[in-house]
């Protein structure tokens, strides 16, 4: 079988896996509430070394803070050359909300929660724990995959609130504290160029990212093979696939939401 056919077969297997995982959502919510709650805590605050930095919430907050700082630094420096430094708040309201914060949140989820899920499911597959669940009459797909998808779906909303506010705070702090721009001027333009609907769409993008990331990572972990080395290979493949998926989704979602019209008008 040639490479194109193998790739098509792999894509079909993945889509079938995603569909079956989503189809189990209703029954999983009824049957496995305790497991979902346990995973919620793990997704938000992490375990082991990840818990030291505050879990996923800490990673997203730190990454968003520093990207927001860069938006403030570079935005002010560039606009100041044109005599329009007052509009640096527009950059924060526009780019952080629509593109930067959602992408940062997606990458953070992939690197922390997603990679962890792949390793967990891969280890369970290698040690035959997944098969043991089936022998005991527990469907492994909803118990291992759908529960994680639901936990990620619920957890990503407060996580993203922290990340988005962190990026806003960083851009404002660097602009008003370091460059000395009036806080009133910054807040005026920030509020003028931040329509609430953009924030809602931003949350919508992140929710889609979270579901896709977790499904991709769970797929590679669920079907891992080849011993401990195979788990490492599965994690690498999952991270690469999820990063590509995030960027493709970001492009098409942004095109669908803001491609034909815009909620922000600078002139005219």
Report each predicted region and the residues it spans:
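Short, membrane-interfacial amphipathic segments enriched in basic
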Residues: 1-38, 220-225
């Amino acid at each position: 079988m040639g490479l194109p056919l193998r790739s098509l077969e792999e894509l079909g297997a993945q889509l079938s896996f995603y569909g079956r995982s989503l189809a189990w959502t209703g029954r999983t919510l009824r049957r496995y509430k305790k497991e979902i709650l346990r995973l919620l805590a793990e997704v938000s605050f992490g375990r082991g070394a990840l818990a030291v930095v505050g879990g996923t919430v800490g990673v997203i907050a730190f990454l968003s803070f520093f990207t927001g700082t860069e938006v403030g630094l570079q935005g002010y420096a560039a606009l100041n050359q044109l005599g329009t430094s007052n509009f640096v708040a527009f950059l924060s309201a526009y780019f952080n909300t629509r593109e930067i914060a959602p992408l940062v949140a997606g990458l953070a989820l992939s690197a922390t929660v997603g990679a962890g899920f792949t390793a967990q499911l891969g280890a369970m597959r290698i040690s035959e724990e997944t098969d043991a669940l089936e022998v005991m009459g527990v469907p492994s797909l909803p118990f291992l995959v759908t529960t994680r998808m639901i936990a990620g779906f619920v957890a990503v909303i407060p996580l993203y609130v922290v990340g988005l506010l962190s990026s806003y705070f960083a851009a404002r702090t660097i602009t008003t504290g370091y460059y000395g721009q009036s806080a009133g001027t910054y807040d005026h333009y920030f509020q003028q160029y931040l329509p609430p609907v953009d924030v809602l769409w931003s949350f919508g993008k992140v929710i889609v990212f979270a579901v896709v990331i977790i499904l991709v990572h769970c797929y590679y972990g669920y079907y891992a093979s080849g011993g401990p080395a195979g788990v490492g290979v599965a994690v690498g493949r999952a991270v690469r696939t999820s990063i590509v998926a995030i960027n493709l989704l970001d492009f098409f979602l942004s095109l669908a939401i803001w491609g034909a019209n815009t909620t922000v008008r600078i002139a005219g």
